């Protein structure tokens, strides 16, 4: 289970060092074989390969004749790249995905349970500000009776 938010520095080659606490779990789940892809919110998704494969199968089972489905297929599967953690626990983000997400030097790694989101620092702060300034957040019906 991946949780927590960590600020990472991207090097000049586009590599990010994954924190040790997550690195060990990623190696245990997938031997360091990961999938990195684009998300409609202009962040990236990082999945252990075994967790990504059933998601990709579901996405590709959608009708390619439906505009929304085919757009989602192009985004999530079309941008998907196999990446590996190197010996130093780093992953390489391709120039295409760096450009898509607007990555510069600082990147936020945000645990989402089964996977991570990677955000440019600017986009991370903007979406946090948007969430925090919302006067009323509408909850999905499934969460109406939920309390923290």
From Swiss-Prot:
Family, as annotated: Belongs to the MraZ family.
Keyword Zinc: no
Entry's localization field: Cytoplasm, Nucleoid
Gene3D superfamilies, sorted: Transcriptional regulator MraZ domain
HAMAP family: MraZ (MF_01008)
GO molecular function, one term: transcription cis-regulatory region binding
GO biological process, one term: negative regulation of DNA-templated transcription initiation
A Pfam cross-reference name: MraZ
Tree of life domain: Bacteria
Domain SpoVT-AbrB: 5-51, 80-123
Disulfide cross-links: none
Keyword annotations from UniProtKB, A to Z: Cytoplasm, DNA-binding, Repeat, Transcription, Transcription regulation
PANTHER family documented for this protein: TRANSCRIPTIONAL REGULATOR MRAZ
GO cellular component: cytoplasm; nucleoid
UniProt-recorded name of the protein: Transcriptional regulator MraZ
InterPro entries: MraZ (IPR003444), MraZ_C (IPR035644), MraZ_dom (IPR020603), MraZ_N (IPR035642), MraZ_sf (IPR038619), SpoVT-AbrB_dom (IPR007159), SpoVT-AbrB_sf (IPR037914)
Complexes and interactors: Forms oligomers.
